[in-house]
Regions:
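Short, charged/polar "capping" segments at the starts of alpha-helices
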Residues: 36, 82, 109-118, 172
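Charged docking surfaces used in two-component/phosphorelay signaling
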Residues: 2-13, 141-147
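Gly/Ser-rich helix-loop-strand patches that form or flank binding pockets
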Residues: 12-65, 154-185
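Short acidic/Ser/Thr-enriched loop-to-helix initiation segments
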Residues: 52, 63-103, 117, 121-129
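Glycine/small-residue-rich hydrophobic helix-like segments
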Residues: 114-168
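Hydrophobic beta-strand segments of well-ordered beta-sheets in folded domains
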Residues: 24-26, 70-73, 97-103, 134-136, ...
């Protein structure tokens, strides 16, 4: 176990935490019954704070419950790296027999749509290497943050796991040098 105490903006701390701990995955909890939208453990606030993180997060409800791995939702978009997240989806499918669903929305911009199509093709090909055939769910909502849509969809359709795309690019330095994930992978 590793522990660290940081002071400052929650979004910046969460973004740096994985690297400071040299973590592969960080487990955190959220309070789905929280009525106040500005609380740090509210799912919508938590997802917004994690969007810059380069470390995978496993988010659990604060209530004890048996986790159901039968259905896994993998969000994909146009701009984020998807290799690590797709590997996590394949892990659940291979070792828990999970059904994997690719969750995405289309873009009006043809370049963004092309990038999304490439990410979808990559995810399908990688999962296919493990004999996993994912189902697809295309959202019609282009305005709401995709991860928040996935949270609502997963709750409605009884998904046990959501794998969100947390790498959000890009500082000027990242654009020149490249994202750390690209170099590692």
């Amino acid at each position: 176990h590793s522990y660290i105490s940081l002071k400052g903006n929650s979004k910046e701390i969460i973004g740096k935490l994985g690297q400071l701990l040299n973590a592969v995955i960080i487990v955190t909890s959220c309070n789905t019954n929280e009525k106040q939208k500005n609380k740090a453990d509210n799912p919508s606030v938590l997802l917004k704070n994690m969007e810059n993180s380069r470390t995978a997060y496993l988010i659990c409800n604060q209530k004890e419950s048996i986790v159901d791995y039968k259905k896994v939702l993998l969000t994909l978009n146009n701009a984020r790296e998807s290799k690590e997240k797709t590997l996590w989806a394949s892990y659940f499918a291979r070792f828990f027999g999970s059904e994997v669903t690719l969750f995405y929305h289309t873009y009006k911009d043809s370049f963004y749509q092309k990038q999304l199509n490439l990410n979808l093709a990559f995810a399908r090909k990688m999962l296919g290497q493990f004999s996993i055939i994912p189902s697809n769910h295309k959202s019609e909502d282009r305005k709401t943050l995709l991860d928040l849509q996935a949270l609502n969809y997963a709750d409605k359709e009884n998904y046990g796991v959501i794998i969100c795309q947390t790498t959000k690019d890009k500082s000027f330095f990242d654009k020149i040098k490249g994202l750390e994930e690209v170099k590692v992978l």
